[in-house]
Amino acid sequence: MAGSSFGRLFRITTWGESHGPALGVVIDGCPPGIPLAPEDIQRDLERRRPGKRLTSPRGEPDRVEILSGVFQGVTTGTPISLVIFNRDVRSGDYTELAEVYRPGHGDRTYEQKYGVRDWRGGGRSSGRETAARVAAGAVARKFLAGRGVEVKAYTVAFAGLHVDSFNRDEIDRNPFFCPDATAAAAMERRVEELRDAGDSCGGVVEVSARGCPAGLGEPVFDKLDARLAGALMSVGAVKGVEIGAGFAAAAMLGSENNDPLTPDGYASNNAGGVLAGISTGMDIVARAAVKPIPSISKPQQTVNTRGEPVTLSIKGRHDVSAIPRIVPVCEAMVLLVLADFMLHPAPVEKR
């Protein structure tokens, strides 16, 4: 199976399955001399971890171990290998799915492509794989922090509910990573309603990056916004991405969408911090549309591996929504893209 690596200069390869012994990531290209301890990675993993009140009850501690690439608390420039052991695997919950295709999942497409599939929670296609991405993103965060770049993701829509205000300090005060406390409370009530109904929901995650210098990105086929979109679309539950004004720009006039230039910089940021594929120096802003979790207890129609009709009600430990756990995953993917581009040739300074 190809496709488990991401990045060019700051390059990662994730490995492992949802119900295997462990999962992890190898990071190649991280510069030497960056202070890095397990606690730096653990903080981000805690934000994604299952077993919390509004997420899957699967009780994974997600303790990371650094196997290589760090000596005396700093990176050495050699490949960094991180491992997270699976501690709460219950493959028996999935036995009845061995011969049934789950609607909305990759069961059938994996089998059509490879002739075999891991039915224990989806194997590589499981959201559990994203723990490795978050671990890698934490390393990228340490690298970028030394260059003044800060990346933050948060929920702006959930099950049809939208934020009406933005308080950056509120993001880490609620389980949805939502900048609007009132909206977060409504989201929590909605989770309980959907859980009782045996259904699920999606939402929208926004990611913003502050402190990015102008000049990141390459023209034509390696544009910064193209790489950001591809990175976010690689997350399993993401079905759409927009940068800056995004799809709203289609309804604007040119005079409304253009970001006027002033002696002090840009007067607005409809471009989302990227023009012609190259960063402008403004905040980079991207949004990801997240689909509902397909594993629901509400009865659904499907077929088994013999093509026979089946009514399926999925049991097991599942989230009502990929939000909030997908929020740090989207954050990690943007961190990885920016770290990669920061290692490209530096922008030419104006003389």
Curated annotation (Swiss-Prot):
Q: Write out the GO MF terms.
A: chorismate synthase activity; FMN binding
Q: Which keywords label this protein?
A: Amino-acid biosynthesis, Aromatic amino acid biosynthesis, FAD, Flavoprotein, FMN, Lyase, NADP
Task: List cofactor names only.
Answer: FMNH2
Binding locations of NADP(+): 48, 53
The record's comment on cofactor binding reads: Reduced FMN (FMNH(2)).
Q: Which InterPro entries match?
A: Chorismate_synth (IPR000453), Chorismate_synth_AroC_sf (IPR035904), Chorismate_synthase_CS (IPR020541)
**Family, per the entry?**
Belongs to the chorismate synthase family.
This protein is called Chorismate synthase
Protein source organism = Syntrophobacter fumaroxidans (strain DSM 10017 / MPOB)
